[in-house]
């Protein structure tokens, strides 16, 4: 019997489930702007924060079960990333490609073309099992005048006891030069995903209960 009622995902301490227009993001934005005198860099920072607001708004519009993100200043510069979890239903026999995932999430590439660096593969999530994963640099139309290029990782988590229901963990970042580091971080976050009962007991891939999560 399927006893999974909710999920847990460990996100870094610097990530928050907050309104991107709130006080903490505003402080980080001010700090980032103060770190440079270059008008072009200031414009880029403002654009990144505007895009961040639109990413989280779009996620909520499309029914995200979880929306989290970070805007953190490091010595090397500003790092931004977003994490979202969506519930989707995939009919039997449907290929798990990036366009399919994008359509399921209600987000299409701005130019309608799959990313050239798209990789469709499998990944091992300890508390879930072997899952499908798609990575790529997506150009996504957020609003009528905003396109954003993001490093993305979509990981399909099969709901225990179902062959068609999935939770999709989507992680994205506009920090394109940090591709390897970003994907390592995303993999580490996704690695912590697990399904649990209402009482917080972990549910194994076959739907049976295990230890407390």
Q: Where are each of the predicted segments found?
A:
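Short, mixed charged/polar active-site loops
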Residues: 6, 147-151, 166
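Secretory pathway targeting signatures of secreted, lumenal, and periplasmic proteins
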Residues: 1-107
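Structural motif
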Residues: 7-10, 161, 184-185
């Amino acid at each position: 019997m399927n006893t999974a009622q909710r999920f847990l995902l460990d996100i870094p301490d610097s990530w928050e489930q907050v309104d991107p227009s709130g006080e903490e993001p505003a402080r980080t934005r001010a700090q980032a702007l103060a770190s440079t005198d270059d008008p072009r860099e200031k414009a880029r920072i403002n654009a990144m924060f505007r895009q961040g607001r639109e990413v989280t708004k779009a996620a909520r519009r499309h029914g995200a079960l979880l929306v989290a993100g970070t805007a953190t200043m490091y010595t090397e510069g500003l790092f931004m990333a977003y994490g979202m979890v969506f519930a989707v239903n995939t009919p039997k026999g449907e290929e798990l490609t990036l366009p399919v995932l994008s359509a399921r999430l209600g987000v299409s590439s701005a130019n309608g073309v799959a990313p050239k660096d798209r990789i469709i593969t499998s990944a091992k999530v300890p508390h879930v099992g072997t899952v499908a994963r798609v990575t790529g640099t997506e150009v996504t139309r957020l609003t009528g005048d905003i396109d954003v290029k993001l490093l993305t990782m979509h990981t399909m988590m099969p709901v225990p006891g179902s062959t068609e229901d999935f939770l999709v963990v989507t992680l994205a970042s506009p920090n394109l030069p940090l591709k390897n580091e970003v994907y390592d971080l995303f993999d580490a976050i996704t690695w912590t995903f697990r399904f649990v009962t209402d009482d917080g007991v972990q549910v194994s891939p076959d739907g049976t209960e295990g230890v407390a999560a």
